[in-house]
Design a protein with these regions (language model features):
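C-terminal motif of bacterial Sec signal peptides marking the signal peptidase cleavage site
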Residues: 17-21
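Short cysteine/histidine-rich metal-coordination sites, predominantly Zn2+-binding motifs
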Residues: 100-109, 120-131
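Iron-sulfur (Fe-S) cluster-binding segments and ferredoxin-like electron-carrier domains
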Residues: 92-100, 111-120
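Processing junctions and N-termini across compartments
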Residues: 16, 80-83, 100-103, 119
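Bacterial signal peptide processing site
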Residues: 23-25
């Protein structure tokens, strides 16, 4: 447990330093926070302290496939998680969402999706919910098996 807390603290510091160097040059339409590095602990660990009511875009590589997740904290203090891939447009290189004016917008079909449903609505033109994760107080942990099961949906992705 002590090693895990030290790793969590080190990664949080690295993340804070990385985020401090970001800014100024971001796309105007992309109003959300981008968490560029998350911690690896037999999967992906996302520091809860870094999340806000605006969606964070979390980059991850699984089995050589670049992926991205959305994470935010709602008004009730609950974490909402989803993969940044459109379930209806899956297979399209543009089946991902960008955030603008309080909405997530599918870059393939243009559907607008409200933040209140992130991670809660399955099926349709919306981000795919993360089905297996745990909270350990300081971080949300998504196991490698969960990430590996969804990675194929990102194979044709053109966001990166």
């Amino acid at each position: 447990m002590k090693k895990r807390m030290l790793a969590l603290a080190a990664m949080s510091l690295a993340l804070a330093l990385a985020l401090a160097g970001c800014g100024g040059d971001s796309k105007a339409a992309q109003e959300a926070t981008e968490i560029e590095e998350a911690m690896a602990v037999d999967g992906l660990a996302i520091p809860v302290a870094e999340l806000t009511a605006e969606p964070s875009f979390i980059d991850w590589e699984q089995d050589g496939i670049a992926m991205q997740l959305l994470a935010l904290v709602n008004d009730d203090g609950e974490v909402q998680l989803a993969y940044n891939t459109c379930q209806s447009c899956a297979g399209s290189p543009y089946a991902y969402f960008e955030y603008a004016n309080g909405m997530l917008i599918c870059q393939n079909c243009g559907n607008r999706f409200g933040l209140d449903s992130v991670g809660r609505v399955a099926g349709g033109c919306n981000p795919k919910p993360v089905s297996d994760y745990s909270e350990d107080g300081d971080a949300i942990v998504i196991p490698t098996s969960e990430l590996a099961s969804v990675a194929p949906a990102f194979k044709t992705w053109k966001k990166f």
